[in-house]
């Protein structure tokens, strides 16, 4: 149904008061990035290590019934960690995908150094979201990731994208320049989105 993929895209977007640019670290099937691009006011870019994944994403998105984006998603074939370190671009929202910590090289995407590099690529008032698939890690790995995250983002909050017993997904989210989260601000933001995004939010039960 794409409900979780839609949440992975839009929960970070609605927690920012006025996003104009969003960077997705990890492209996969393209569903999540396309869901973010439902709002024509948001320019979306996605980075994925494998160009073959980017090429095949359109096929997977079509079979999954992914929503047609309001504007094209810009894609970059690159290592996410190195891309963040080398780019000079800044973004209002940066979203990191569900990287399996046991896969070769993925561990470097959960380090204090990487989280700090991401923070340096946020626009003033920007937001970073790191999604975590809890079923893919043990408790010690989770504790290590959370400890590194809160060192860089002390005001972080955790949100559930999926409370499935089989595939639970939690997000670590922070706006470093924002001292505290205002629930009223998030609720107000959800009433101001584009009609297509509002429909997707309803479909994702947000």
Predicted regions and their residues:
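Class I S-adenosylmethionine
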Residues: 1-65, 70-73, 80, 139-147
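Soluble small-group transferase modules, centered on the S-adenosyl donor enzyme superfamily
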Residues: 1-23, 62, 78-88, 136, ...
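Short "lid" loop at the C-terminus of a central beta-strand within the Rossmann-like core
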Residues: 100-101, 133-137
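A short glycine-rich, Lys/Arg-flanked "PGG" loop and its adjoining helix->strand segment in the class I
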Residues: 110-124, 150
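Conserved Class I S-adenosyl-L-methionine
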Residues: 115, 139-160
């Amino acid at each position: 149904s794409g409900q979780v993929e839609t949440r992975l895209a839009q929960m970070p977007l609605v927690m920012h008061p006025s996003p104009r640019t969003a960077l997705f670290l990890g492209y996969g099937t393209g569903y999540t990035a396309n869901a973010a691009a439902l709002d024509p006011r948001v320019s979306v870019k996605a980075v994925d290590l494998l160009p073959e994944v980017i090429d095949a994403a359109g096929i997977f998105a079509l079979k999954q019934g992914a929503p047609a984006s309001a504007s094209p998603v810009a894609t970059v074939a690159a290592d996410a960690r190195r891309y963040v370190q080398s780019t000079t671009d800044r973004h209002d929202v940066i979203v990191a995908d569900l990287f399996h910590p046991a896969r070769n090289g993925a561990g470097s995407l959960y380090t204090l150094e990487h989280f700090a590099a991401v923070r340096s690529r946020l626009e003033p008032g920007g937001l970073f979201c790191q999604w975590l698939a809890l079923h893919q890690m043990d408790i010690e790995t989770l504790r290590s990731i959370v400890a590194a995250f809160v060192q860089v983002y002390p005001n972080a909050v955790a949100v559930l994208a999926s409370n499935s017993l089989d595939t639970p997904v939690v997000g670590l989210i922070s706006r470093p320049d924002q001292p505290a989260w205002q629930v009223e601000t998030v609720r107000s933001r959800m009433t101001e989105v584009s009609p297509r995004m509002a429909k997707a939010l309803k479909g994702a039960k947000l």
